[in-house]
Amino acid sequence: MDITDIRIKKVESKNSGSKLLAYVAVTFDNCLVLHNIRVIKGQKGVFIAMPNRRTRVGEYKDIVHPISQDFRKTLQTSIFKEYVRENPADLELELDF
């Protein structure tokens, strides 16, 4: 499955402590779109979080997620490259790609 499009919607937060940087939609093979991937700035750097939902007991469960580490790395690298391309001022972020 090839990534054919990545759309980034940067989140401009008035709260300086906000960790959410952007929402991402990734298109695969021009056939399937995965929405609501989040780019988050954590204590150990920037990472992606997959779409999830809250269960009745308050736990968050991923709706969809990569099965292999290789694909997660490919997806994360592609998203980070597009994020930096669209937001060159954010180059100081600790992006792992």
Swiss-Prot record:
Pfam families per record: SpoVG (PF04026)
GO biological process: division septum assembly; sporulation resulting in formation of a cellular spore
Cell cycle among keywords: yes
Residues passing through the membrane, by range: none
The UniProt record lists the keyword Cell cycle: yes
Keywords: Cell cycle, Cell division, Septation
SUPFAM superfamilies, A to Z: SpoVG-like
Gene3D superfamilies in the cross-refs: Stage V sporulation protein G
Name assigned to this protein: Putative septation protein SpoVG
Organism taxonomic ancestry: Bacteria, Pseudomonadati, Spirochaetota, Spirochaetia, Spirochaetales
